Amino acid sequence: MIIPWQQVDSETLDNLLEAFVLREGTDYGEHERSLTEKVADVRRQLVSGEAVLVWSELHETINIMPRGSFHAGAEEQQ
């Protein structure tokens, strides 16, 4: 189930974004990027609609996914 990011408390959203970025592992890009920059990138993706907050009832967890991946997974389950 998609959770509208606008309805999440701002401090909670900040914590979710930071946890997501930290969980994603090492960035092997040419230039090292700060945690703040990475969090800002994920926030931009949420705001633009490229990414969505997804609640898993099965696992009782929340995750951030590319919008296209969420729809593909939802179609496979139907």
From Swiss-Prot:
Pfam families: UPF0270 (PF06794). It comes from the Bacteria. InterPro entries: UPF0270 (IPR010648), YehU-like_sf (IPR036685). Belongs to the UPF0270 family. HAMAP family: UPF0270. This is UPF0270 protein YpsIP31758_3941.
